[in-house]
């Protein structure tokens, strides 16, 4: 049985992904920040692991990841506090990458956002700036690891029933991305080796997810 750990397992994408992977036969460990999130993730079929990644040291992260074949980073500070945003979305994310390498976990899937990167264009006075900077640094660090990484870059997240269809050639005018579609893309990517070393930009669209992801070609450093 494939074993995977989802960091940020109580988030909306993490919960949706847990259910999908359990249905596909994965054994899911769901990393959560507080014990009061335990019952929710257990109900999704995952094994809860209480670990505050903002405060966790390297050894604790290595121990949490050991024995798994893949890790998904779907955690986030949630904005509002720049110091905590850098601590979680950049520093803790990078520690998790180092821990994955030390624990021998090869596959690493990062949930980022459409437009992330050093040229994100967000003004420093904008409250989104710390998040944009943190994600740019974390994504770039991941690209420079030895891991079999994939970065997902969905557009603005929405709720509601997922369409199951996306586009991997998004335009600026149509950037909404259903969280259920993000979870489905993550599951499809984990089953598609050709997505290794890819940054996949996508939004809701017209192509079935399996077809869209299956049509991608692996390009190292993309």
Describe the predicted segments one by one.
Residues 3, 69-70, 107:
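Structural motif
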Residues 189-213:
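Core catalytic loop region at the nicotinamide-binding pocket of NAD(P)H-dependent oxidoreductases
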Residues 30-95, 99-102, 190-194:
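NAD(P)H-binding glycine-rich loop region in Rossmannoid oxidoreductase-like domains
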């Amino acid at each position: 049985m494939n074993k995977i750990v989802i960091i940020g397992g109580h988030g909306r994408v993490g919960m949706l992904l847990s259910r999908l992977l359990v249905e596909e036969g994965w054994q899911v460990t769901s990393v959560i920040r507080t014990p009061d999130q335990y019952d929710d993730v257990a109900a999704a079929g995952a094994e809860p692991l209480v670990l505050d990644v903002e405060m966790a040291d390297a050894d604790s992260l290595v121990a949490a990841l050991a024995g798994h074949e893949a890790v998904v980073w779907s955690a986030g500070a949630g904005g509002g506090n720049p110091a905590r945003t850098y601590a979680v979305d950049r520093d803790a994310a990078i520690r998790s990458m180092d821990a994955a390498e030390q624990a021998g976990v090869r596959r690493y899937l990062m949930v980022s956002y459409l437009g992330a990167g050093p040229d994100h264009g967000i003004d420093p006075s904008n409250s989104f700036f710390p998040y944009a900077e943190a994600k740019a640094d974390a994504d770039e660090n991941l690209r420079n690891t030895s891991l079999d990484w994939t970065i997902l870059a969905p557009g603005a997240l929405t709720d509601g029933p997922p369409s199951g269809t996306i586009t991997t050639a998004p335009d600026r005018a149509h950037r909404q991305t259903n969280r259920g579609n993000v979870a489905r893309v993550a599951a499809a990517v984990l089953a598609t080796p050709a997505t290794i070393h890819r940054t996949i930009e996508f939004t809701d669209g017209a192509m079935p997810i399996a077809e869209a992801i299956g049509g991608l070609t692996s390009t190292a450093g993309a």
